[in-house]
Amino acid sequence: MKLLNQSQVSEFILLGLTSSQDVEFLLFALFSVIYVVTVLGNLLIIVTVFNTPNLNTPMYFLLGNLSFVDMTLASFATPKVILNLLKKQKVISFAGCFTQIFLLHLLGGVEMVLLVSMAFDRYVAICKPLHYMTIMNKKVCVLLVVTSWLLGLLHSGFQIPFAVNLPFCGPNVVDSIFCDLPLVTKLACIDIYFVQVVIVANSGIISLSCFIILLISYSLILITIKNHSPTGQSKARSTLTAHITVVILFFGPCIFIYIWPFGNHSVDKFLAVFYTIITPILNPIIYTLRNKEMKISMKKLWRAFVNSREDT
């Protein structure tokens, strides 16, 4: 990504979550543990899905890709956030700031489309079970994943040029733990109304639209499973509950931040922490604790690993 901006500002100062060094030390310990667990948890899901023949299904293929996105989403800024907690002055370069913004919206866009793809997968599995393997074949699954990355790239690449070429000639303090469009663009020296419209139209409306589509899809699925057997209903509802929980946890903060991106919301930076640091660790917990197949496969994989170590 080429940065063409010739502003006087060469770096941004991040205020972080608190000015208390004691609290920052506690956050350093907490975020470090969360980050390590997030990476290991999502990595465990990926390894389990792609090394277990029983999980060679469209749903788990998409879940494995979602775990990769979550692991990457947790890594685009969190390591620097953790290191900054040990510093008095939290500084990020101009290029580094907009790289964070680009990656945030790229990965956020990919996750949105993946969640819609997972909803489509559940719709076909429950509403059209006889045609499931025909519709959700390997080519379709790969196409859904590739499409999610292309749309994520389009989503991020569309709005970045408008922001990166704004003139930043003075204020450079960002009231957050990392860079994001609403907080950075409001520091520009010119009227940013057009950029505000672009952000609301691109990030806000897309987030809200995807969320509504997902709610409608899962509502239709819940209506359909009423006609299933009690056993089928229980399994389907358990899976759907996990999916819906992830959708709400991810889209809730995004909609709040980007539908009203330039309001003075003191909670914005805490919401940013939630969907970039907390949500990626909740996804593997939600999907594994409510999924017997995943838990059984993880135990088998662990036993195989332990046995292989004992043999050597």
Swiss-Prot record:
The keyword Cell membrane applies. Residues 1-25, 80-100, 159-195, 259-269 are extracellular. Disulfide bonds join 97-189. The keyword Membrane applies. Keywords: Cell membrane, Disulfide bond, G-protein coupled receptor, Glycoprotein, Membrane, Olfaction, Receptor, Sensory transduction, Transducer, Transmembrane, Transmembrane helix. Glycans are attached at residues 5, 264. It is found in: Cell membrane. It is a multi-pass membrane protein. Residues 50-57, 121-139, 220-235, 290-312 are cytoplasmic. CDD domains: 7tmA_OR4-like. GO terms for molecular function: G protein-coupled receptor activity; olfactory receptor activity. The chain crosses the membrane at residues 26-49, 58-79, 101-120, 140-158, 196-219, 236-258, 270-289. It comes from the Eukaryota. Pfam families: 7tm_4. GO terms for cellular component: plasma membrane. Belongs to the G-protein coupled receptor 1 family. PANTHER family: OLFACTORY RECEPTOR. Odorant receptor. This is Olfactory receptor 4K17. The gene is OR4K17.
